[in-house]
Amino acid sequence: MSEKIYFEPTWELPNPFYKADGSIMSTKAEWEEKRKAYLELLSEMYYGKMPGRPQTLTASELSNETICQNTVCHKVVRLCAQGEEAPVFFNVHVYRPVMPCEEKLIPVVIPAANTLPGEIISMAAEQGFEICSFEIAEAAPDDKEKIWEGGCAKAYPGYTWRALAMWAWLQSRVIDWLETQKDIDVTKTVVTGHSRMGKAALCCGIYDERAAVVAPAGSGCGGMASMRLSGCRLGENIGLSERIGVMLNKERFPYWLMENVADYGTPDGKNRFRENEIPFDANILGACVAPRRLILVEGLDDDWINPFGTQVSWLAASEVFEFLGVKEHSAIHYREGGHAYTKQDWSVVLDFTKVQLCGKEKTTGYKSMRENENKAGYSWRCPKTNN
């Protein structure tokens, strides 16, 4: 573990405000140094080390058609990222409003969702958003054996990255391509995704600072749900939600994250569970997005995804946003229902983006951390800053 991370095993959510010597930070510059240390730790212990920007990125258009009653142009673009040992090919599905907008379009980049419902595409287009989704089957297939035969693994064989990091890397390559496009405001890029792709979107948003809004939906374990604390909407049914050891079990998804992190969530004969020994938790993942924007959209009945653990992690992450003077940059929205990325969820993400990046009035009911918020899962608080 990095010597820059001070940590004592605890079942509370880890305190991100400790400096390396165990004292509490008091400046924003100290947080930025701590954030860099966390990024190194996550590469070492969680996501694996991923490569940087490729040597070259080229694009070719495969198809172009109008959909949604001729209101949206859907084109398929094939990207080729030149890796160290081989090229990485993957397709991007672009959904652009046909009618010109008053301002440059805001790009929303989402992974592995080229079959988006028409109502979502239409709603986004009506509000001035361009959606770019991409395919993963060729570059990083979601399979514990095939993924090592995909384009990402072959192009960068010397890296320890796992599936979530590969998908996040592909998401960043879409942003690379967007930077070459006219009529796009790439400074307002949103990265999002649902479930396992929400986990990947969070990873992308942590490492790629071009992501102005990071919007994981129902991301659960490996995303914004705590590895230490779990429960349903009221904190009941502790133990019902997915744990890191279960998720990374060799019969399920051992290729999503680094293998050693699974050991903390797997009984070893001496200790039942050891997630308290992990020097970070989901609140640290969310905090690493700050001071940019973070919005979570969740279902109250999505028990396997750990609604309680997500809520407390979000609150704890919001302490860092408050420390940086931007607590309104962190928000969460719960709806009735289960595991899905619904039209209501999308409406919240788009509204939050317009409020935060375009100065529009808020029209949906997401929340940010309030003054004197009732906290759970941690006893520490945001320290006062000297700048």
Q: Can you say where each PLM-predicted feature lies in the sequence?
A:
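Loop/turn elements at helix/coil->beta-strand transitions in domains of secreted/extracellular proteins
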Residues: 103-108, 127-130, 186-188, 209-213, ...
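Aromatic-residue-lined binding/catalytic grooves and analogous aromatic/hydrophobic interfacial grooves
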Residues: 92-100, 176-178, 265, 269
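Cap/lid segment of the alpha/beta-hydrolase catalytic domain
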Residues: 104-180, 220-230
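Alpha/beta-hydrolase-fold serine-hydrolase catalytic core, especially in secreted/extracellular enzymes
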Residues: 1-91, 96-101, 209, 258, ...
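Generic beta-strand/beta-sheet core signal
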Residues: 134, 192-194, 216-217, 297-299, ...
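Mobile cap/lid helix-loop segments that gate and shape the active-site cleft of serine hydrolases
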Residues: 216-285, 306-314, 322-326
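Flexible loop/turn segments at secondary-structure boundaries
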Residues: 116-118, 139-142, 198-200, 221-226, ...
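Primarily recognizes the serine-hydrolase "nucleophile elbow" in alpha/beta-hydrolase
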Residues: 173-243, 274-277
